Amino acid sequence: MAEKDSIGDIADDFEEQLVAPAADRVGFLPGLLRWVAIAVGAVIFIVTVVTATALVLAKQGSSHTAYPVSQEFRESRELLQYYESVGLIRTNTADALPGTVVVSVALGYPLNDKTAQQELSARLVELKDFLRSYFQRKTLSELRPEHEQKVKIEIRNEINDNVLSRSKVKDIRFTQFDVLKP
């Protein structure tokens, strides 16, 4: 009987070995699905945290940046179109030891004013000659940065009075304004 018991034990052990590995093995697909579910959950969590953080920061920032401004304090400037075809003007100043002026001028006229645009194009040579002679008459001290606004006003007035006849320039801007001392 002892042999029968030992054979029974062997059979029981063999049976456990056959059944146990099948229960431990889940398979490739369910394991993969588990990792995919973990990754999707992590992505959802990260997106939720980032969105919540962005919303909190946006609410805090908006209260500091939005200031109501009344109509009387808003500056309303006329929209202008700029004529920039004059190009670069290079000339010497009127000093005893002349400096060099290199300037590029943009002439502002009312938006969609075809007359001004046509007249500026037609008088391009006159404009270049006027600007060259204007800067030749000036000294280095008259062309310092603190006098720039005065220079712009003088140029605008002289162009309107002496160069243009059918239209007017409203604004002068320098896209380049270099005064080189000798």
From Swiss-Prot:
Location, primary (coarse class): membrane
Biological process according to GO: bacterial-type flagellum-dependent cell motility; chemotaxis
UniProt-annotated location(s): Cell membrane
Keyword flag Signal: no
Membrane topology: Single-pass membrane protein
Transmembrane portions of the chain: 36-56
A cellular component annotation (GO) from this entry: plasma membrane
Keyword Cytoplasm on entry: no
Keywords, sorted A to Z: Cell membrane, Chemotaxis, Flagellar rotation, Membrane, Transmembrane, Transmembrane helix
Main function: Controls the rotational direction of flagella during chemotaxis.
Family: Belongs to the FliL family.
NCBIfam families: PRK06654.1
Name of the protein in its database record: Flagellar protein FliL
Organism of origin: Treponema pallidum (strain Nichols)
Taxonomy of the source species: Bacteria, Pseudomonadati, Spirochaetota, Spirochaetia, Spirochaetales
